[in-house]
Amino acid sequence: MARVPKRNNEPTQNDDPAQGSVQAAAFSARRLLRAARVGTLATSANGHPFASLVTPACAPDLSILMLLSRLSPHTRHLMADPRCSILVAGVPESANPQTTPRVTVSGTAEALQDPAAKSRFLAIHPYAALYADFGDFSLFRLTPADAQFVGGFARAHRLDGATLLPDAEAVATIAAAEDGILSHCNHDHPDALAAIAAAPGAWRMVTADVDGFDLAQDERVRRFAWSAPVATATGIRTELVAMTKAARATARETH
């Protein structure tokens, strides 16, 4: 049976990290974070918890980017007290919502002016280009300090920042190669990207990192995970070749 590419990155019972290592739990948590298009941000409102819907995007190093308006209460909270947490969730395995994989990341948030980070955010949330340059909007970066990952019912892991975050050297290596990877795949292998996307239309690779990559078609963006973290451009090529073969084999089986 061909291996189907992992899409949307929700851990399932078959890859339960509780049955493996803490590193596997960290990888599953990163998959959820990098795939998340919506999350719940918890800030402090004069000492009281305040929960807000936000649209996160992960930088290559897993810091969490959020485009926030200063008109929003949660932004004012962060400016007064940068300590916060964010919850993102996957898809439940059954009718019981407690089977939903989820991760809560705690840390501190700061406003930043970084064109590369802004481009990263807009690659994940292209619709936000409509208001990203409004005067009241700023990009914030949440630096993870620790996390609580729950792979499903009664499958919890506490992860410190050092365990959760990807290898810094690998992050830097892939980040340095990313532009070349995107250009090569988009210009030379659009058919492979279409096979992996398994959906009509022209798909472009818009990000690549140690944990996976994102494909976009207009404002639709899909996340795909590697089978394991990669550390080099060669590792990415190996993963993409395997995913393309698996996707094409699956397409043949279903037609």
Task: Give the positions of each predicted feature.
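Binding-site signature for planar aromatic cofactors or substrates
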Residues: M1-H255
